[in-house]
Amino acid sequence: MEHDGYHLPVMVSEVTDLLARRPGIYIDGTLGGGGHAFSVMSALRRSGFENDSLLIGIDQDSFALEEAAGRLRPFASRVRLERGNFSEMAAIIERIRLREGCRLPVMGILLDLGVSSFQIDTPDRGFSYLRQGPLDMRMDPDGGWSAADIVNTAEESELAGIIYRYGEEKKSRAIARAIKARVREKGDFRETAELAAVVRSVVAGHDRQIKSLSRVFQALRIAVNDELGVLESALEDGTACLAPSGRMGVMSYHSLEDRMVKRFFRDKSEDDWGPKGVGLREPLRSAGFKLVTRKSVVASDDEVRINPRARSARLRVIEKKELEGESHDRVYQ
């Protein structure tokens, strides 16, 4: 698939094959440069479903929305772009339905988690220890606390907890201690390079330094953007929005997210048999969903060679079951 300077989307064919199956509303909650959205709309057009479908693209980043608008121009009449967080998708869907009188069912939702290559490679965003820039890390450049705010104001124990919990970094206490000592001695952190230097001073060996830097920057990014809390809300709201036979796909890039998605999808797809030992003949509640992917889908070796970012990606998909008397053709308001 052709791509532009924003970023090369991961597992495009797999996402499209698993999600773009029927006419309806499709949500790309992490629109980015619009690569996945373009592929989904292209597939719907080839299947003759374009005129009976609507794609809603959501992103916090106004630059991403501008990039995606250009890419999705061939489908402009069937695309709506909204600035916001994907945890707000239920409200966004309802707003568009009311505004346009749209009664199509929600048949597909995609969340491609993590930071885009464009954001990582843009120094002013402060996501990478490889790029000199302000220590920011906000997905929404206009809102909330930055990473600098956290490292400068958090107590040492709180900072250590963030680094350990969200980065799974074993030297979290030593790194937090060094960060707060640096604040006391030299003042507030402002640049990514300043934080990177402190981490390197604590961790010995180049390879270990690189791993610790990745973990510390990941931990701060997750904390700044409340990524796990946002994901939890989005999983609940997204599955609630789906019509029968509708599917939700989530692509994660680190173990914290993947474990959360795996656990949530498993719980949604299992019958409720009540407390252990009761010995019920029938479940108290039948599962309303089924797993489409029993194991996570990973990128092919060929794709990883072309796009190394795909190496850590894990895609999981769940489908809402059709209850007796229900159909995906039912109209939802």
Swiss-Prot record:
S-adenosyl-L-methionine is among the record's keywords: yes
Origin: domain of life: Bacteria
Compartment annotation: Cytoplasm
EC top class named in words: transferase
Annotated GO biological process: rRNA base methylation
Keywords, ordered alphabetically: Cytoplasm, Methyltransferase, rRNA processing, S-adenosyl-L-methionine, Transferase
GO CC list: cytoplasm
Binding site for S-adenosyl-L-methionine: 34-36, 59, 86, 112, 119
Pfam families (alphabetical): Methyltransf_5 (PF01795)
Stated family: Belongs to the methyltransferase superfamily. RsmH family.
Described purpose of this protein according to its UniProt entry: Specifically methylates the N4 position of cytidine in position 1402 (C1402) of 16S rRNA.
Protein name as catalogued: Ribosomal RNA small subunit methyltransferase H
Origin species: Prosthecochloris aestuarii (strain DSM 271 / SK 413)
